[in-house]
Amino acid sequence: MPEIYGSWASRRENIATLGTLTSLAATDAVEVSGINFTFVHEVTGGNVTVVDEGSLDGDNWFSLDEEKAHTQSGVDAHFYPNRVVRFVRSRATAIGSGESVTISMACD
């Protein structure tokens, strides 16, 4: 985790692409300095469920909100205000064969 994303940086440096998931897995974690988060899920396919997670130590993870189920291809944004965490990541909890989700995150 070479960079810290958050409110102290210029706006364009507050955005990170966490990765593309094609199976039940988690993206790489990034360190953040902020309390307001926007996660963008760019879905290809129609059976993708993602949970966006936070952590205080990078080892123990918890959900920022409920799982987000996507039933068609497209782009969806999810907003999490007032979440105090040090690290964030996303995890696919259901994903069909040949489907994918690319996840980006912005924080402030």
Model regions and ranges:
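Surface-exposed molecular-recognition determinants
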Residues: 8, 34, 74-88, 104
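Extended, low-complexity segments enriched in Ser/Thr/Gly and acidic residues that occur primarily
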Residues: 1-13, 91
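Surface-exposed ligand/attachment interfaces on beta-rich extracellular proteins
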Residues: 13-31, 44-49, 70-77, 95-99
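PLP-dependent class I/II
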Residues: 43-44, 58-59
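Edge beta-strands of jelly-roll/beta-sandwich modules across compartments, strongly enriched
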Residues: 2, 91, 96-108
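Conserved Ser/Thr-centered positions that define the repeating blades of beta-propeller domains
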Residues: 53-55
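Noncatalytic modules at the cell exterior or secretory-pathway interfaces
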Residues: 33-39, 82-99
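Solvent-exposed serine/threonine-rich low-complexity stretches and specific carbohydrate-binding patches
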Residues: 10, 63-72
